[in-house]
Regions:
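Class I SAM-dependent transferase core
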Residues: 1-102
């Protein structure tokens, strides 16, 4: 998906679904998850998606839309180092109750 406006729609849906999976309602977190490109933390695709019972499978191509799911992606798969599960990140950020400094 090359169209940035289409990818922005995908990111907004991802943010809403991620917070719902974590059972969180926080507009600031939802905005943050929608605004920050996940692919910036994963390097160039195709990417390695982690699947239970413990193996990584490459994405079909390097389309960043494939990253906007509540799944782990391998950074160093042979060492089982991944980027972390988005809903867990959301839950931890919500629990931290970070406040804006003005």
């Amino acid at each position: 998906m090359d169209n940035q406006s289409d990818l922005a729609i995908v990111r907004r849906a991802y943010a809403k679904q991620t917070l719902a999976a974590a059972r969180i309602s926080d507009p600031r977190l939802q905005t943050a998850f929608a605004a920050i490109p996940r692919e910036d933390f994963l390097g160039p695709g195709p990417w390695l998606a982690f699947h239970v019972p413990g193996f990584y499978q490459p994405t079909v191509d390097a389309d960043p839309v494939l990253l906007y799911v509540n799944e782990l992606f391998g950074l160093v798969a042979e060492r089982r180092i991944n980027n972390g599960q988005p809903s867990l990140h959301a839950a931890l950020l919500a629990a931290a109750a970070i406040q804006a400094v003005v």
